[in-house]
Structures are given as structure tokens and as C-alpha cells.
Amino acid sequence: MADALANQLNNTSLGEANSEMRWREQLNMPAKDARPQTEDVTATKGLEFEDFYIKRELMMGIFEAGFEKPSPIQEETIPVALTGRDILARAKNGTGKTAAFVIPTLERINPKSTKTQALILVPTRELALQTSQVCKTLGKHLGINVMVTTGGTGLMDDIIRLNDAVHILVGTPGRVLDLASKGVADLSECPTFVMDEADKLLSPEFTPVIEQLLSFHPKDRQVMLFSATFPLIVKSFKDKHMRNPYEINLMDELTLRGITQYYAFVEEKQKVHCLNTLFSKLQINQSIIFCNSTNRVELLAKKITELGYSCFYSHARMLQQHRNRVFHDFRNGVCRNLVCSDLLTRGIDIQAVNVVINFDFPKNAETYLHRIGRSGRFGHLGLAINLINWDDRFNLYKIEQELGTEIQPIPQNIDKKLYVYDSPETIPRPISNPSQPRQITNTPANTSTADRRHHNHPNNGQYQFNRGRGSYRGRGQGQRRSAQTETNKFGHPQGQHSGKTSTAPVS
């Protein structure tokens, strides 16, 4: 009798073990990312996601999204967040901060309740879309509803959606406050309050809104703040609104180890020529090019297209639906280059970006840090190139000193090992659309301009502005602008505008 019970118990244990192994084998796992990684994400304690004792359904979403092991910020944050304690976390850009708060937030959601149980605030609309998509992807087996709400979209649509159960609300502060003030978004039983890019959200323009939003939450809420930089204003918020927060600081150095930084002294009128040279010499998978103003963004995007390179652009003055489309298409590899303002400096995660170019050098170290952090995501390699004029030399020195980093003069030839991967096809597709194939391919650097134009565009070299898309791709009418003649910031007249963008030279 005892032997029979022992055999039955042994068979049951083996069956459970086999079942434990089988559930992972049945997952729709993405191809393994074979690119090397730096210690920014590999210097861990050796924990596995299973060590956090989270729901199997959540682990299924984690593994199917391509996550393999937790990064340092995830190791430090997830176990503490699961206890409900307030957290103040500081870590480098691109090291896994989003998953560090999304995973414990998802774990604590009760899908049987119809109440909103978590509010995640971010400073920009693009980051709100990206964060909500991460929540949906990781939590796709949990049976929960995630809603994103931002300014620039119809308020009535949000009101209709909030009539149904919304477990996690992701949005920008102004729109969420509007919904809460109208009694549409009920946060009275919402125990989790998360702020990503908290330094931006606690700037003077947002702080009053944040404090009003907190008043709609229960007093025993959990508050979690995440950012790469924490100014003094964060300490003031912590002392006023957080209860004995667990503080995490993984910023032993400020810049990502995988990003190589260079500068080139260039006269203003030679910047476009220098950019053209970089395009012809570098092996770019995808690049983001930053300008300091929206006017320069549009002018530069047009000039890049005239040089024969595919190009999108995005800035804050565009309609939200157009910004969303540009962001979506660029993430999915429709276009190789994106020119933008500082709209996309925070949190935007596009794994395929291996080159960031500061066409206009930023004015402060914080902006510089966030800009270059768009490459080298999650411990991978990247390149940051800064085009410096004579007036920028003091900012260059100041930023080097404040960040404790070295920005080197650009060499004649840049070693491809610093930013190029042996197998670029192994770069993960966007988490928001893992099934959509990439549409860009590598163009040889020595290809002629005409060949590049044919390679990058299916439109036989016609480069009218694609209305409403923020891209110069050869379709549609131009965006109408002021008809009066004005002088652009490159020192040249923009001319008359009548439905097409100006053909004035950028340099």
C-alpha cells in the first residue's frame, strides 16, 4: 500500500514537472536577439522571472514578448513593487524601466473587478501609446483592459470607452485630470499611481496637475516614480506625497556604455553637407536626427529627401493622428530616417535605431542624455554624432563635465564594430506589431544618389510632401503654410507657400 502511494506521488510530481516544462514549449516565442549586450543590462544578480512568483499568464506574455531575464532595474524594482511599497527608481535610458513597473502593476490587477486599478502617467502622447502597448502585450493572457488617453484626441471617445471596464489607464496628465474632474474616470479605488519620466512630470508646468490627480486616489495608494534624472523638485514631491519610499539608484554613470559619442566642428552652412557625408559613410539601420526647433525639423527633412534619402519628420505642431502614424510607421521600419524636435527624446524605444545625430546641439545635459539614449537600447551598441558650431563649444564642455563623459572628435573612419551588428535581421520587431515585416533594407554606402533615391522610394523620385504624414515620400499635396515670405533660421528666404513646402535651401 505504501509503495503504491509512493509510486502515485512520484508519478504526480513527474507529471507536474513535465507540465511545467510543456507550457513554455507551447509559447509563440520570437527569434532570439543575438546582438551582444553591455553591463548596463547584463550586470544582474542572476534572478529569473520565475523567481518573482508571478502569475503564469503574466510570464507567458513576458516570454512571448521576447524577454529572457530581468535587467538590473527590473531585479531591484519588481520584488519591492509587488509588496505595495512606494518606489523612487533611477536608472539609465533603455535599461528596462517600463517593464520594471508594468510587470508588478499587471500582477496586482484583479481582472474580475471592473474598477480602474492603476494609473500610469507619461509626459508625451507617443510615450503613452508605447507604454499602453507594452501593458497590452505583456498582459495579453490576463484578461485585462488597458486604455490610453491623451490630448489631441476626441474626449467623447474616451468617455464612451470608460463606460466599459478599464483596469489600467495610461495617459498624459492634462487629459486624465479632465476625465477625473468630470467624474468620467473613477480613481477612488485605484491603488497604483505610476509616473514614468517623473522629472518631466514634476516640472512646474505639470506639478499642479499631478497633485490634483493624487487627490482622486485613495490615501493608501502606491506611488512609483521612474526616471533617468531626478532634480531637486522630485525630493520635494517625495517628502510631501510618498510614504517611506524604497529608493533605487543604478546611475553609477550617466551615459549608456554601448553608445560611442563623437563631435564634428561644422560651420552652420556646411551642416547639411556634413550630414550627407555621414549618410554615405555610415551603415545606418535607422537613425533619429534632432533639431532645436520645429521650423528646422521641416526644412531639414525636406533637404534630406532632396539628397535622395527616405525621411519622416515629427514635431509638436503636427496633428496628433499624423504624429501617431509617423511614430507607428517608423517603428515598423517603413522609413530609415526620422527628423524630430525634442518631442521624442523621452522613453521612446525603437530597437533598430543605431545612430543618433544632433544636427542642432542641445542646450543642456539633461536633453543631451535623453537624446542619445534613443540609440543603444537595452544594452546594445549605438552611435551619437554631434554637429557643433563655434557657439556650441561651451555647451559641449559643460555637458561633458556634468555627465562625466567624453565626447571625442569624429575620426576619418568609424569602426563598424562600435554600432553595426553582424546580423541586423535579428533585431526584434516592435513590441506593438511583432508580425509586421520590416520594409527597409540596407543600402550600400557607395550607391549613387539616383540609385539611393530609387532604392528608398517607390515613387520615381517625386518628393512632394505627403500631407498629414510628416514625411517626404512623394504622395499627396503639400502642407499649406503662411503665404508671406519669411527668413528661415538657416539664413535663407523661405519664399511663397501655396500648398507645397518651400524649396528654399537649408544651407
From Swiss-Prot:
Location of the region described as Disordered in the Swiss-Prot/TrEMBL record: 1-20, 425-507
EC number: 3.6.4.13
Organism expressing this protein natively: Neosartorya fischeri (strain ATCC 1020 / DSM 3700 / CBS 544.65 / FGSC A1164 / JCM 1740 / NRRL 181 / WB 181) (Aspergillus fischerianus)
CDD domains: DEADc_DDX6 (cd17940), SF2_C_DEAD (cd18787)
Coiled coil feature spans: none
Reactions accelerated catalytically: ATP + H2O = ADP + phosphate + H(+)
Name of this protein: ATP-dependent RNA helicase dhh1
Gene Ontology terms describing biological process: mRNA processing; mRNA transport; regulation of translation
